[in-house]
């Protein structure tokens, strides 16, 4: 079993007056942002990752979101590249780069290859489709989200694995000359993980590629169903999957004593900081999260409505 350290790296500033805000996506002006506080938080979160490695965590996990204070990391590759240099043992797991918003996946392939080399082969590269927030904020057409995800994935794998130069003429990406000088240390490429929240298509696609499926704080019963769908798909494709093929993001609060941890944890679950309470839209306005064309009819929104 691999245990990793993960946090959304949220904005924290009591003077911002954002506690209890109904929605934290695209509706809060960045006039509330204080660069001095931001500078402190970015360095603090990096220090936490270094400490997590010292405490024995197997992996340091990073993600990215855009135009929202609940996740300060808008460019996950920046944090990953810093950790590649200042840590020594732990895997660096990106959960993950939002492929559909990248207009230049060759540039992404080069960045990730550099991170893998600087870390001496510790990179695990996660790829995600992203939510409606990312498409909305970066002017990416939601109805082509899955197509762009799959084509960008195929291109990056080829750029990492096949000798160049070669030409790429796809539906969404076109290159006259592909010959990245930066190639990953791990050959033919770093491990790929696929985080999801979850859709039938994504589960089956992930199983078909034999990538680990990472479910992000989804309800337990649908999580079991999704994992079983993965295992069933693997069996249909002729291989036996196991615990090495699935992962789960679990929320944990640690404090000085068990009693204090439970007290603070319950305040989080039942207080204004819980984005899923009745009358609260949550981190994402549903109208933005589920943009037309972004999700299929098979999609079930499984993000955990946490209860005390």
Language model segments and positions:
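N-terminal beta1-alpha1-beta2 module of alpha/beta enzyme domains
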Residues: 1-87, 190, 301
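Flexible, glycine-rich active-site loops centered on histidine and acidic residues
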Residues: 2-38, 101-167, 212-215, 219-221, ...
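Hydrophobic faces of well-ordered beta-strands that scaffold small-molecule active sites
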Residues: 3-5, 60-62, 92-94, 123-125, ...
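Active-site-adjacent beta->alpha loops and helix N-cap segments on the catalytic face
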Residues: 74, 78, 221-226
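Acidic (Asp/Glu)-rich catalytic clusters
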Residues: 82-88, 116-122, 207-208, 238-239
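Conserved, mostly hydrophobic/aromatic
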Residues: 83, 115, 156, 192, ...
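Aromatic-lined glycan-binding groove of carbohydrate-active enzymes
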Residues: 201-207, 226, 243-283
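Conserved small/polar residues in nucleotide/adenosyl-binding loops
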Residues: 300-306
């Amino acid at each position: 079993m691999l245990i990793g350290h993960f946090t959304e790296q949220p904005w924290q500033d009591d003077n911002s007056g954002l506690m209890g805000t109904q929605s934290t996506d695209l509706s809060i002006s960045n006039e509330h942002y204080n660069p001095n506080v931001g500078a402190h938080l970015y360095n603090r979160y990096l220090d936490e990752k270094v400490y997590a490695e010292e405490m024995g965590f197997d992996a340091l996990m990073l993600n990215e979101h855009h135009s929202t204070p609940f996740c300060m990391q808008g460019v996950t590759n920046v944090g990953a590249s810093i950790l590649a240099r200042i840590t020594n043992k732990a895997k660096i797991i990106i959960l993950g780069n939002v492929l559909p918003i990248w207009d230049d996946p060759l540039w992404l392939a080069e960045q990730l290859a550099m991170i893998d080399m600087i870390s001496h082969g510790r990179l695990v590269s996660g790829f995600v489709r992203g939510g409606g927030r990312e498409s909305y904020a970066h002017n990416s057409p939601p109805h082509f989200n899955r197509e762009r995800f799959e084509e960008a994935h195929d291109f990056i794998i080829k750029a990492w694995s096949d000798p160049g130069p070669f030409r790429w003429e796809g539906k969404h990406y076109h290159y006259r000359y592909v010959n990245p000088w930066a190639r990953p240390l791990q050959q033919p490429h770093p491990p790929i993980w696929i985080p999801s929240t979850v859709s039938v298509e994504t589960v089956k696609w992930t199983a078909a590629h034999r990538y680990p499926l990472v479910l992000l704080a989804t309800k337990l019963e649908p999580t079991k169903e999704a994992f079983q769908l993965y295992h069933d798909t693997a069996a249909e494709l002729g291989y036996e999957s196991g615990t090495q093929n699935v992962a789960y993001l679990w929320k944990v609060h640690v404090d000085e004593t068990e009693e204090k941890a439970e007290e603070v944890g319950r305040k989080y679950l039942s207080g204004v900081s819980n984005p899923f309470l009745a009358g609260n839209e949550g981190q994402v306005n549903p109208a933005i999260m589920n943009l037309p064309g972004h999700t299929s009819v098979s999609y079930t929104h499984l993000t955990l409505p946490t209860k005390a």
